[in-house]
């Protein structure tokens, strides 16, 4: 998208948010996620929250894991730093705040390895944000003032079906879930995750919720495809309802 198109689309984020919500019926508003490099202007306020006491290894953060910011970002816009994300070392790694070597020294990463929940090869193969950010900004897509890098939605099984129909090449991932943000940003790909036990415990996501991500630069394209898919699905539902009358 050209700079001229970006300027002309600045006021379209509320409309795109509404269209996404109508098509996918998410459980919360779409969240815009923007990665800010050192030296870039950050207009979003810092999220003010105290840090709990660090554990015996010195690990703490503003929230139990960075995925918790997804929950807050549905209703407020704020900027976060590496320290804010630091209680979850896997999330800090996938978001570019830690290198693989740094993450491997953290006690929570050792804990997941020792438990057998995930192995080193799986972590080494995770997609990650390649450039360390100065900050990550979260907020409702409807309130965005510029194109976000990624838009994240919490959706149902119905929403996942609709998105997969609209974007057949969409990736469907498992744990640790946060890596789908890196997939969208670095690979320009639409992706979804069935979730992760750690993330569900920390965020309070309901069992029926899933997460999906759309690259900011593909929002218009994907939204249009979703709307076309919804129309087709409605016609099939109507057909099935008429056909089912024979069984009444």
Can you say where each PLM-predicted feature lies in the sequence?
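Acidic, serine/proline-rich low-complexity intrinsically disordered regions
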Residues: 3-248
